[in-house]
Structure formats: structure tokens, C-alpha cells
């Protein structure tokens, strides 16, 4: 009996052990499955990476060639027999300064050379001073290292020294290595000499390989990025206008849009890419100004800054497109009937504005001047904006509270009637008229005033019948929303339409900045004369 009683916990223990082993086996099998799947998919992903942009493959090949050449030169015993122990600096130089773009390699090479030369010269001077100090040699070296580290780090924080940040790092590294290693070997001069020599060797190999073997230019990418921004903003502009007129509504706004992250929404991704390209443009600009003349950029001082300036003008227009997209995402929306009233004018402004952006994008991409005058370029879109303004002026009663508008209209008519009565009394003192004539005149004026008031109120009543965006009564959590709140919501919905229209007109006004920036760029960069003025729509 005791044996049977003791077997129960043993069976439970064995059962738990079997269950835990099953769980562990399942986890191991899932891990192995994921590992094999990752290994299986890795070659395909690597192939897709190189196939999508062959320049990435070229960059990797060039890096391998540069390292191989550097190692081959170091292995030659005759010319660099005494420098074999410093060979690592040549390889480190290739690894550190070989960059994707030619301009980036030139920038890093210049910074590394500048930092090495300054640190080597200063370290040799400090070394000679420390030797003269005798027994205080190490104290002098430590103090000088502290002063050099403090001074270089402090100067690096100065705003104008930001482009030379890498030079400061190389300076501190070279300065410390020359002093410390030279103090151990008692040969400061050879340490500085071979370090500078091998760094120069590595930098030379990097520049030759990067410039003459499948070069990748930052200026070319900057040029393409600016042209791409035009097309992206044009697509977003057309999409926003068409979406607003089609009463596009989001069932649930994506969280990525609310947090301003990358999203697949074409309306959102178009203007976002133009707005987010600021940092990329600045980086490409810093590299492009170092690059030698190449391809269509045949001048040493090519106006790369004007490309960034032109892109800034496009970005200024993209902000209005962003605000228009915000109107689509807004909770308070104008009724489809009111949007339909202004649909033709809104669509025309959107199409003409996108047409202008695409035209400038093509001209920037082809590096062509405009064959038309600057005033004619914006003529159609400005006329469309004027037509929209006139339509808003003629239909402005749709964009305000109807009762307030009617009250203002009645007050204006009453004031006009009082002015007419006052003028009639003044004329009575100057011109003698019969009482019957005065009576007939007053009756006619009052009758016309009443007819106008009745005509206005009938028009207003027809409008009130057509408005169905906001109900007169609604229920929220079992409570009745009063009529005042409904009128407030109705007025707000009308104002959203006015906001969208005003943003579109503001977009047209900002196009002039693009025209001015493009004219300046085309003049400085020497764009060729235009061949065809018909843009692709």
C-alpha cells in the first residue's frame, strides 16, 4: 500500500518532465525551422539587394580591390622593408576613409591627412621638448597629451569646425600614438614618418580605386533627389484634391500617419519624402562640393547649393499639401453637396499646379531652361486660382452660418431703406413735389425691398433643404444634442471647405518661389536651351 501511495507523485513528476521536454523540443524545432528559413532566404535577399541597385555591388567590389592592393604593396619587402611593423596603418586608412561616394572619400581623406600632418608635426616638437626635460620627460608628455586632448575636443564643439570633426579625432589618435610609442622606442621621427607615409599610401589607393573604377557621385544623386521631389509633391497634390472632391474617408487613420512614420499611403508618402529629404540633401551637398567635374557637371564650382535651395522651395509648397491632407484626415468634414459646388475650380487648380511641378521636375532632370517666359509658366494656374477665388466670393454664403448671414442681410437692407428715407426727406426741402408722388415713391421702394428680401430668404430656404451633413438632432450616449451644437458643427464643416480652398490658393502663391529658384539655378549651372515645352501629365 505504501509503495502504491509513493508511486503517485513519481508518476506526476515523470508526466511533468515529459511535458517540459515536449515544450523544449517544440521550441527547439521552431528555432531550427526559423534558422533554416533565414539561411534559405538570405541568398535571395542578398541577390535582390545587388539587383535593385548595382552600385552597392560595385562599392563592395571596389572595397575588396582597395584592401587587396594595399596588402600587396605592403608585402613588397624592398621599398617598405623597415615599415612592415607600421603596415596596419595603411589598411586602417583604407577601411576608415573608403566611402560609398567619391566626395565622401575625398572629405575623409582630406580630414585624415590634415589631422595626421598637424598631429605628427606637433608631436615631434613636444617629443624634442620632453627629451630636453630629462627626468621630467614623462611628466611633460602626459601634460602635453592632456592639453592636446582638451584643446582638440573643445575646438571640435565650435559650430564652424563641424566639417573637420574627423580630422580632430585623427589628430588626437596620431598625437598620442606618436608620443607614447616613440617614447618606448626612443625613435619619434621614424614613427611619425612611417605613419604619415603609410596613411598617404592607403589614402592614395582609396582615391584611385574610388574615382576611376565605377565611380559613384553624390552630386548625381542630389540632382536626381531634387527632381524626384517635384514629382512626389505633384502626385500628392493631385491625390489630395481628387480625394477631397470624392469625399474619401478613412475608417481608421493609420497609426504611422498619426506619428509621422513611413507609410504606404500614396498621398502621405509623396509629400513626406520631400519633407524628410532635408538631412539627405545636406549630406549629399557636403560630399558633392568636394567632387571634381564629371558628366554633365563640367564646372569646378558647380552650384550644388542652388539645388538644395530649389528643393527647399518645393518643400515650402509641400507643407501646404500636408495641410490639405490634414483636411482629409479631419473629423469635421464639409458636406458632399458643398464640395460639388466648388469641384470644377478646385480640380482645375490642382491639375494646373501639378502640371507646373512636373514641368519643373523634368527641366531639372534634363538640365534644360524654360522656353516660355516666367510669367507664362504660371499663367494657367494663376487664372485657375483667380476663378476659384471668384467662385468663393460669389458662393460665400455657403461657407458661413446661414442664420447669421440672413440676419446681416436683413440689417443691411434695413439700413439701406433708412438711408433712402433720409434722402427722400432731404430732397423734399429742395424740390417741391406733390404728396402723391412722394407716397408712390416710398411705396415702390418698400415694395422692391420686400421683394429682394423674399427672394433672398427663398434662396436661403432652398439651401437649408439641401444641407444634410449635420442632422438637426442626434443622440450621443442617450443624450440629445441641442440645436445650437448642431449649428456649431455645421459652421465648422463649412469652414473646413474654406480652409482647403485657401490652402490650395496659398500653394499657387508659393509657386513663385520655385520659379525664382529655378531661374537662378539654370543660370548658374548653365542649363541648355529647351527643346520641348510639353510636360508629361
Swiss-Prot record:
InterPro entries: ALMT
Coiled-coil ranges from the UniProt annotation: 373-435
Transmembrane segments: 56-76, 86-106, 109-129, 131-151, 196-216
Family membership: Belongs to the aromatic acid exporter (TC 2.A.85) family.
Subcellular location: Endoplasmic reticulum membrane
Name of protein: Aluminum-activated malate transporter 5
PANTHER family: ALUMINUM-ACTIVATED MALATE TRANSPORTER 10
Protein topology in the membrane: Multi-pass membrane protein
Lineage: Eukaryota, Viridiplantae, Streptophyta, Embryophyta, Tracheophyta
Main location: endoplasmic reticulum
Cellular component terms (Gene Ontology): endoplasmic reticulum membrane
Primary role: Malate transporter.
Keywords: Coiled coil, Endoplasmic reticulum, Ion channel, Ion transport, Membrane, Transmembrane, Transmembrane helix, Transport
Biological process terms in GO annotation: malate transport; monoatomic ion transmembrane transport
Pfam families recorded: ALMT
Organism: Arabidopsis thaliana
Amino acid at each position: 500500500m505504501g509503495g502504491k501511495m509513493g508511486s503517485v507523485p513519481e508518476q506526476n513528476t515523470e508526466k511533468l518532465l515529459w511535458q517540459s521536454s515536449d515544450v523544449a523540443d517544440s521550441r527547439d524545432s521552431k528555432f531550427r525551422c526559423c534558422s533554416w528559413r533565414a539561411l534559405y532566404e538570405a541568398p535571395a535577399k542578398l541577390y535582390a539587394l545587388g539587383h535593385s541597385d548595382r552600385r552597392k555591388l560595385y562599392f563592395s567590389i571596389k572595397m575588396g580591390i582597395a584592401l587587396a592592393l594595399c596588402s600587396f604593396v605592403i608585402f613588397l619587402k624592398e621599398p617598405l622593408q623597415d615599415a612592415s611593423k607600421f603596415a596596419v596603418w595603411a589598411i586602417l586608412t583604407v577601411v576608415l576613409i573608403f566611402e560609398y561616394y567619391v566626395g565622401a572619400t575625398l572629405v575623409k581623406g582630406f580630414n585624415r591627412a590634415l589631422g595626421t600632418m598637424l598631429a605628427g608635426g606637433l608631436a615631434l616638437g613636444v617629443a624634442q621638448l620632453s627629451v630636453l626635460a630629462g627626468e621630467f620627460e614623462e611628466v611633460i608628455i602626459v601634460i602635453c597629451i592632456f592639453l592636446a586632448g582638451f584643446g582638440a575636443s573643445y575646438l571640435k564643439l565650435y559650430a564652424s569646425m563641424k566639417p573637420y570633426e574627423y580630422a580632430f579625432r585623427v589628430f588626437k589618435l596620431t598625437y598620442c600614438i606618436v608620443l607614447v610609442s616613440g617614447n618606448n622606442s626612443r625613435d619619434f621621427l621614424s614613427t611619425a614618418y612611417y605613419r604619415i607615409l603609410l596613411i598617404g599610401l592607403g589614402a592614395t589607393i582609396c582615391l584611385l580605386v574610388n574615382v576611376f573604377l565605377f565611380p559613384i557621385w553624390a552630386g548625381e544623386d542630389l540632382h536626381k533627389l531634387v527632381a524626384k521631389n517635384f514629382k512626389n509633391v505633384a502626385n500628392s497634390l493631385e491625390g489630395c484634391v481628387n480625394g477631397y472632391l470624392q469625399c474619401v474617408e478613412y475608417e481608421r487613420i493609420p497609426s504611422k500617419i498619426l506619428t509621422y512614420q513611413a507609410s504606404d499611403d500614396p498621398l502621405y508618402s509623396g509629400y513626406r519624402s520631400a519633407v524628410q529629404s532635408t538631412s539627405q540633401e545636406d549630406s549629399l551637398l557636403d560630399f558633392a562640393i568636394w567632387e571634381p567635374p564629371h558628366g554633365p557637371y563640367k564646372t569646378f564650382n558647380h552650384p550644388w547649393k542652388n539645388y538644395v535651395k530649389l528643393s527647399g522651395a518645393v518643400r515650402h509648397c509641400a507643407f501646404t499639401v500636408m495641410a490639405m491632407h490634414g483636411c482629409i484626415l479631419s473629423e469635421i468634414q464639409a458636406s458632399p453637396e458643398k464640395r460639388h459646388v466648388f469641384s470644377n475650380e478646385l480640380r482645375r487648380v490642382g491639375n494646373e499646379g501639378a502640371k507646373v511641378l512636373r514641368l519643373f521636375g523634368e527641366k531639372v532632370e534634363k538640365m534644360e531652361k524654360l522656353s516660355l517666359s516666367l510669367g507664362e509658366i504660371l499663367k494657367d494656374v494663376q487664372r485657375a486660382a483667380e476663378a476659384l477665388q471668384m467662385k468663393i466670393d460669389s458662393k460665400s454664403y455657403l461657407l458661413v452660418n446661414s442664420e447669421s448671414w440672413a440676419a446681416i442681410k436683413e440689417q443691411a437692407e434695413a439700413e439701406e431703406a433708412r438711408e433712402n428715407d433720409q434722402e427722400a426727406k432731404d430732397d423734399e426741402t429742395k424740390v417741391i413735389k406733390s404728396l402723391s408722388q412722394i407716397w408712390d415713391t416710398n411705396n415702390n421702394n418698400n415694395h422692391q425691398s420686400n421683394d429682394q428680401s423674399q427672394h433672398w430668404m427663398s434662396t436661403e430656404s432652398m439651401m437649408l433643404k439641401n444641407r444634410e451633413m449635420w442632422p438637426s438632432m442626434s443622440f450621443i450616449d442617450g443624450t440629445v444634442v441641442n440645436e445650437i451644437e448642431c449649428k456649431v458643427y455645421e459652421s465648422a464643416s463649412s469652414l473646413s471647405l474654406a480652409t482647403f480652398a485657401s490652402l490650395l490658393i496659398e500653394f499657387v502663391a508659393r509657386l513663385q518661389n520655385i520659379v525664382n529658384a529655378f531661374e537662378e539655378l539654370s543660370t548658374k549651372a548653365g542649363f541648355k536651351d529647351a527643346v520641348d515645352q510639353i510636360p508629361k501629365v
